Structure formats: C-alpha cells, structure tokens
C-alpha cells in the first residue's frame, strides 16, 4: 500500500522524534519525575531539569539530522521499487 506524502511526512517526523527521545531518555525521565504531581510550581521547581532536558534534545537534534532520516527512507523506498521492478521481469 502506498502512503500519501502527508503520511510519509508524519512517519518521518515521528521516527525523528523517537530517536531524539531515545537519545535523551534519562533527561526526560528526570524532568517527568520532578514535574509529577506539580502544577504551577513546575516552572521554578523543575527549572534545572527542564533546561537539561531541552539542552539534550537540542544537541540530539543537531546530531540526528532529520534530512539524514529522509535520505535513508528515500533510499530504502528506491531499493524496494527497484526490487519490485526486477521481480516483474
């Protein structure tokens, strides 16, 4: 089944976010642990955890290029297409 360009875009962004979250799992868990059970006080009580988490995600986003993921996805898509063409011959 072929995906629409919008579905492909959604999948690529989801894959990129998954990699970012995996890379910063500890920082995210630390922030969640601090924020659990708080409402307004999260702003000042969890400031350092929030900064650490954001810094990690920013650094990971610089290292894990969304365009690299797109390139790998397109390469796999082309290989799949070529494989199907070879089967038809």
Swiss-Prot record:
PROSITE patterns noted in UniProt: CHCH (PS51808)
Residues spanned by motif Cx9C motif 2: 46-56
CHCH domain ranges (all copies): 21-64
Compartment list: Mitochondrion inner membrane
An individual GO BP term: mitochondrial cytochrome c oxidase assembly
UniProt keyword annotation of 4Fe-4S present: no
Motif (Cx9C motif 1): 24-34
GO MF terms held by the record: copper ion binding
Keyword hit for Disulfide bond: yes
GO cellular component entries: mitochondrial inner membrane; mitochondrial intermembrane space; mitochondrion
Keywords for this protein: Chaperone, Disulfide bond, Membrane, Mitochondrion, Mitochondrion inner membrane, Repeat
Domain of life: Eukaryota
Membrane topology: Peripheral membrane protein
Disulphide linkage map: 24-56, 34-46
PANTHER family xrefs: COX ASSEMBLY MITOCHONDRIAL PROTEIN, COX ASSEMBLY MITOCHONDRIAL PROTEIN HOMOLOG
Family: Belongs to the CMC family.
Domains: entry comment: The twin Cx9C motifs are involved in the recognition by the mitochondrial mia40-erv1 disulfide relay system and the subsequent transfer of disulfide bonds by dithiol/disulfide exchange reactions to the newly imported protein.
Task performed by this protein: Required for mitochondrial cytochrome c oxidase (COX) assembly and respiration.
Name of the featured protein: COX assembly mitochondrial protein 2
Organism: Schizosaccharomyces pombe (strain 972 / ATCC 24843) (Fission yeast)
Gene: cmc2
